Amino acid sequence: MLRLDLQFFASKKGVGSTKNGRDSIAKRLGAKRADGQFVTGGSILYRQRGTKIHPGLNVGRGGDDTLYAKIDGIVRFERLGRDRKRVSVYPVSKEA
């Protein structure tokens, strides 16, 4: 009599790990001061990656492209042509 050794395949697929389940923390980018708001020198105006908004008058650009006020004054967000924006800080006139 013949004896057969049969090997059946698994009826259930092996369970792998999921590729979901992680999320990076927000970087808190964007405007930190509004148009027309009074700021002091050194105040952060806009946090960004790259130059989405360019520095204007009395505004500096940090190593991580953060825009900051160089003097005390009023913040103004302005357009440069059709597709560029800039932020400037204008000094407040001292009237008695």
From Swiss-Prot:
It holds the Pfam family Ribosomal_L27. GO terms for cellular component: cytosolic large ribosomal subunit. The gene is rpmA. This is Large ribosomal subunit protein bL27. Transmembrane segments: none annotated. NCBIfam families: L27. Keywords: Ribonucleoprotein, Ribosomal protein. It comes from Geobacillus sp. (strain WCH70). The keyword Ribosomal protein applies.
